[in-house]
Structure formats: C-alpha cells, structure tokens
Amino acid sequence: MQDCIICGGAQETNLYSVASFDGIQSFSIREDNPAKASRPFDRDRDGLVPGGGAATVIIESYEHAVKRGAPILAEIVSWGFSGNGDHISTPNVAGPARSLELCLNKGGISPQQIGYINAHATSTRIGD
C-alpha cells in the first residue's frame, strides 16, 4: 500500500465536446446572465454551461500525514460504486442510491454523519 498518491484529471472544451452537448439540447438558454445560467437541482433549471477544467488531489494515509505533522483537513472513511448501465446523461436513481448505501454500510456511518456530498449535476431535469 502506498503512503501517498496523486490523482488528477483534466477536460478540455473543444468543438466536438460542445457539439455533442448541443446535439442533445442540454445547454442553458440564459446566455444573457452566465453567472445564474447553470442551476443544478433548481426548479427553474434549463441546462448546463459548457466549460473545461482540471483538478489534482493528493491523498495520503492517515498515519503518514500524522507522522509528517500535516493538518488533517478531511478523511476518506469509505467509498461505494455501482455501475447501473445507464448513460452518463440519463442516470437512474437506483445506481447512485446503491453507491451511497454501500458507502455508508462499508464505513459504518449514518446519513446524519455526512457533512458534504459533491454531486455531478447537469442542470437538466433528466440529468439531475
């Protein structure tokens, strides 16, 4: 087992990725107000705003972090995965719900102990 790992990824925005989202009519039409255009889980949502991005996360074992005196900002106590076989743009509720259930059971924690969930949302009725 590794003491420390670096995880990262990036997505570029290009003609083909934009065209694929345009083809399924998933863009917001609120281009006159970009700051309020993307509204994940909002009742009045009407689509996403395209963009690229990148992120890197450095994860290390608890023991390794303590040994080097690092401030503990968060702890991964469990994880869950469920491939429901649906398309990324039209997920069903059963797959993500099963993932959360597996995570809670494996970690021995209750939903009330969760302080933050980072969700993937498209600001579309079918994707949210």
Regions found by a protein language model. Give the residues of each.
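Short acidic/polar active-site loop segments enriched in Thr and Asp
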Residues: 2-3, 115
